[in-house]
């Protein structure tokens, strides 16, 4: 089968961090995807953090200053206006009013901190003779300073030490603890082997950013604590992007997982700075998808699974123009089987998509694409794990039973088909792989792709999401590329252009 004439490649190669020179002393804004799974404040899978390390190292090894931006989860988010109002309120509460409280506040500070404050005062010469020890005259010297100077010195101290001295200032507007990136900063520091600075509010980090030195790394707090990040109003997104863009000189994106978002950090910042380059991870994602959507080694097989046909309509339609074989699994397979007249018991079926299934089967026949559906199933009467589930003789599923995985004969046929191909792309599990009795089909696909890659150079791509998670459960596999972007990879395979990729500079 040859690629259809209207099957256009919707992705082009982009300038990468390797093409960007002279990062020394440059403040590099790097959008990463640290949207990692968390449980009780602990990271359960740090793959996305580890995947960004090579680009971070490139920046700091060249003497650049690396400022990382990311989201985590789906916090409610507050508007910038409300956020700024909240910041001002908290600062106001921390101020000293009516010439009261300044000396009292100073008096309870540690001796070392008092000495540091006095060293910046008009009485610094006198202060050089004062010891940090208790009752050496530090508070008395501070008390003699003019009220305006006292206020100025203390506000400077609070700005520089708000974590310890002013805890009410050390959280972002819109802060929700379960979505904070602070645990990510800790893990990143462990992986890098160096301190990672953490800015508690991505839109109030100007002072912290200004203190960074060459080779430093800073992670800003969750950008989705502000609703403008993914807001529908373009002007509001731009306003947020302008603040963030003011922190940096260079923009690099390594966040393929968020590349389908037209957001303040994915598209707004590079538009304002007038440039954007891909990090090593983004470059790899673009390179592999450009190959599989452009001119891949033939034959090319697409393995598509998941729960709903409706979620994969555009993918199936688009990929049908590019592939030689299509293997369908997961619950979506039962809609196709019913469309062909087979019994599916009480398995999931999208009645409204039966006509689409028939149409796709006809298109495939016309284009000489071989669609292969399950020929046996692993079933049970309920959606739960059992020691000995029913394995059907053929495509038909008995009444009162639901299929929860592809059967052994189907596994054999699918593995044989992958073995005939030179390229394979997989999106979506073959069954309910989270339950051990129904995991064999999904794991067999992952292992077949790994073996093919290792033994005969199969170009294998796993399109993120559940497929990537399933592949990781199989242990170390020799897959050419496991995408970090579930939604982004799906949209690419649907033939869509990703805003977060399109905005980057094309490779010359």
From Swiss-Prot:
UniProt-annotated binding residues for AMP: 307-308, 312, 331, 403, 434
GO biological process, one term: glycolytic process
Keyword entries, A-Z: ATP-binding, Glycolysis, Kinase, Magnesium, Metal-binding, Nucleotide-binding, Transferase
A GO CC term attached to the entry: cytosol
Domain of life: Eukaryota
Subunit structure and binding partners: Monomer.
Family in the record: Belongs to the phosphoglycerate kinase family.
Protein name: Phosphoglycerate kinase A
Binding residue positions for ATP: 307, 312, 331, 403, 434, 466-467
InterPro entries linked: Pgk_euglenozoa (IPR027250), Phosphoglycerate_kinase (IPR001576), Phosphoglycerate_kinase_CS (IPR015911), Phosphoglycerate_kinase_N (IPR015824), Phosphoglycerate_kinase_sf (IPR036043)
Binding of (2R)-3-phosphoglycerate, residues: 32-35, 48, 70-71, 73-74, 224, 260-261, 308
Annotated positions binding CDP: 306, 311, 330, 428, 433
Pfam families recorded: PGK
Residues given in the record as Mg(2+) binding sites: 307, 311, 466
Gene Ontology terms for molecular function: ADP binding; ATP binding; metal ion binding; phosphoglycerate kinase activity
Pathway: Carbohydrate degradation; glycolysis; pyruvate from D-glyceraldehyde 3-phosphate: step 2/5
Cofactor(s) for this UniProt protein: Mg(2+)
Top-tier EC class: transferase
Reactions performed catalytically: (2R)-3-phosphoglycerate + ATP = (2R)-3-phospho-glyceroyl phosphate + ADP
Further comment: In T.brucei, three genes code for phosphoglycerate kinase isozymes, which are transported to different cell compartments.
């Amino acid at each position: 089968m040859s690629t259809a004439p209207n099957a256009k490649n919707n992705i082009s190669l982009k300038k990468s961090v390797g093409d960007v020179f002279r990062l020394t002393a440059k403040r590099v804004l790097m959008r990463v995807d640290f949207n990692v799974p968390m449980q009780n404040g602990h990271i359960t899978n740090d793959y996305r953090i580890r995947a960004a390390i090579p680009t971070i190292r490139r920046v700091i090894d060249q003497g650049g200053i690396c400022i990382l931006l990311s989201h985590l989860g789906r916090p409610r988010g507050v508007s910038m206006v409300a956020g700024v109002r909240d910041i001002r309120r908290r600062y106001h509460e921390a101020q000293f009013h009516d010439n009261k409280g300044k000396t009292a506040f100073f008096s309870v500070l540690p001796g070392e901190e008092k000495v540091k404050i006095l060293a910046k005062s008009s009485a610094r010469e006198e202060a050089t003779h004062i010891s940090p020890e208790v009752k050496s005259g530090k508070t008395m010297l501070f008390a003699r300073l003019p009220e305006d100077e006292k206020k100025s010195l203390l506000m400077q101290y609070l700005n520089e030490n708000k974590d310890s001295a002013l805890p009410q200032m050390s959280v972002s507007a819109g802060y929700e603890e379960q979505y904070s990136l602070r645990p990510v900063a800790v893990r990143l520091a462990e992986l890098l082997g160096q301190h990672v600075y953490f800015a508690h509010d991505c839109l109030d980090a100007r002072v912290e950013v200004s203190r960074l030195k060459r080779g430093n790394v800073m992670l800003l707090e969750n950008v989705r604590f502000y609703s403008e990040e993914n807001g529908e109003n373009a002007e509001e997104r731009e306003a947020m992007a302008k603040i963030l863009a003011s922190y940096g000189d260079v923009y690099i994106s390594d966040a393929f997982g968020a590349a389908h978002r037209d957001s303040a950090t994915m598209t707004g910042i590079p538009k304002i700075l007038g440039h954007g380059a891909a990090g090593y991870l983004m470059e790899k994602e673009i390179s592999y998808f450009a190959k599989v959507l452009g001119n891949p080694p033939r034959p090319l097989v697409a393995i598509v699974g998941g729960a709903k046909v409706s979620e994969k309509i555009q993918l199936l339609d688009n990929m049908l123009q590019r592939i030689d074989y299509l293997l369908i699994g997961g619950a979506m397979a039962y809609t196709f089987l019913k469309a062909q007249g087979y019994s599916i018991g009480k398995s999931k079926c999208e009645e409204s998509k039966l006509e689409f299934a028939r149409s796709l089967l006809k298109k495939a026949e016309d284009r000489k694409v071989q669609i292969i559906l399950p020929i046996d199933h692993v079933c049970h009467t309920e959606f739960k794990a059992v020691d000995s589930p029913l394995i059907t003789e053929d495509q038909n599923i008995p009444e009162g039973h639901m299929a929860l995985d592809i059967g052994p004969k189907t596994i054999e046929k699918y593995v044989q088909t992958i073995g005939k191909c030179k390229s394979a792309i997989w999106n979506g599990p073959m069954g309910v792989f989270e339950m051990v009795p129904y995991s064999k089909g999904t794991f067999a696909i992952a292992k077949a792709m790994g073996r093919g890659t290792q033994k005969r150079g199969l170009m294998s791509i796993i399109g993120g999401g559940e497929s990537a998670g399933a592949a990781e459960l199989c242990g170390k596999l020799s897959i050419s590329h496991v995408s970090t972007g579930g939604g982004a990879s799906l949209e690419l395979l649907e033939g869509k252009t990703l805003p977060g990729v399109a905005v980057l500079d094309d490779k010359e």
